[in-house]
A protein has these predicted regions:
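Intrinsically disordered, low-complexity Phe-enriched regions
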Residues: 17, 31, 44, 52-53, ...
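Conserved beta-strand position repeated once per blade in WD40 beta-propeller domains
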Residues: 43-45, 89, 217
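Loop/turn residues immediately N-terminal
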Residues: 17-22, 51, 59-62, 97, ...
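Single conserved hydrophobic/aromatic residue that forms the stacking wall/gate
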Residues: 1-5, 9-12
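Per-blade loop-tip surfaces of WD-repeat and WD-like beta-propellers in eukaryotic adaptors/scaffolds
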Residues: 17-33, 61-74, 124-132, 184-189, ...
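Eukaryotic scaffolding regions of large macromolecular assemblies
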Residues: 105-108, 113-303
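Loop/turn segments within WD40 beta-propeller blades
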Residues: 3, 45-50, 91-95, 163-166, ...
């Protein structure tokens, strides 16, 4: 939906009264709409049509509900896990398909605890007729924590849909990783390997030019109108100066204050990306300062 957004603001102090609550903010009306009936929320994502959303919980469960707070379904946590896991990130890709990243729950709730980066990435597919769930693990994490592991865990993801022959292309980054990985679905889900010269890699810190940097935001720009050079023009026997139609731009903002931009070029694409949009000259709304949402006191009644 154009008037709503999904994001998670993490607090290092779990004792905070606002810890784990979820709120709906209407961006067009510039007002808080409601507080959702969920506790210990760790992540969230809108459905593809923006009519519902799914919240990942500290218990490892997924709560599906409407923006008005009506609970539609509860998806169980990862079965037979030897560790206590919470939902670090959830991407609602199709009506019954969820890309979920789990992380190990910290052993304590102390403020000075060490960050934990023990991720597991799963594709969860729900069969509504048989009322069953299929959990399929990715053998490798495409955004492993091989960078600054002193940063608090956070997963970032954004998706391109129906860029045939790929049904889904998911870019994924981790707060403790220096790379941006890619997961795709053509005939099956798989981690996509990019050439070294084409792989998004975050630069060293501008402070000392040796320290790793990590992402703090990841987004796609679908409004570009500029053509881009075709990297395979010469290999195809075409004019080396040949260009491709405008493509999506992947933005990565780092903790060093650097904004990186990458053209997303799909060399096997059957046509330009169908999700490109045009930007109106006048914005639909102008954001204004908002008061903080009113947080109700915790109730003794368990959440639905």
């Amino acid at each position: 939906v154009s008037s709503a957004a999904s994001d998670v603001y993490k607090r290092q102090d779990p004792s905070s009264r606002q810890h784990g609550t979820a709120h709906i903010l209407d961006l067009c009306e510039a007002q808080w709409v409601c507080t959702l009936p969920a506790h210990h929320v760790t992540s969230g994502c809108w459905s593809t049509r923006g009519k519902q959303l799914v919240l990942g919980l500290q218990s490892g469960e997924l709560l599906q509900l409407t923006p008005e707070g009506e609970v539609k379904a509860m998806l169980p946590p990862l079965p037979e896990s030897e560790r206590s896991l919470y939902v670090e990130d959830v991407q609602w890709l199709e009506n019954h398909a969820f890309l979920v990243t789990y992380n190990t729950c910290p052993p304590t709730a102390e403020h000075n605890q060490e960050p934990v980066h023990e991720y597991e990435v799963f594709m969860i597919v729900r069969d509504p007729k048989a009322n069953t769930m299929t959990y399929s693990a990715f053998p490798l994490d495409v955004a492993p924590p091989f960078g600054d592991t002193s940063r608090w865990p956070c997963r970032y993801a954004c998706t391109l849909r129906d860029w045939m022959p790929m049904k889904h292309i998911v870019f994924m980054a981790c707060s403790a990783s220096t790379d941006v990985g890619v997961i795709g679905f053509r005939h099956a889900w798989e981690a996509l390997e990019l050439e070294d010269t084409s792989r998004p890699v975050l630069p060293f810190s501008s402070q000392d030019e040796t320290s790793d940097t990590g992402p703090v935001a990841l987004a796609l720009d679908l409004s570009s109108t500029d053509s881009v050079p075709d990297p395979n023009a010469a290999a195809k026997g075409e004019d080396p100066s040949a260009t491709l139609p405008a493509v999506p731009i992947l933005y990565v903002y780092t903790n060093d204050g650097v904004l990186l931009a990458y053209h997303v070029i799909f060399t096997e694409a059957e046509a330009p990306y169908p999700g490109m949009v045009s930007i109106e000259s006048n914005p639909a709304f102008s954001p204004s300062a908002l008061p903080a949402p009113t947080i109700p006191q915790p109730s003794s009644t368990p959440a639905p």
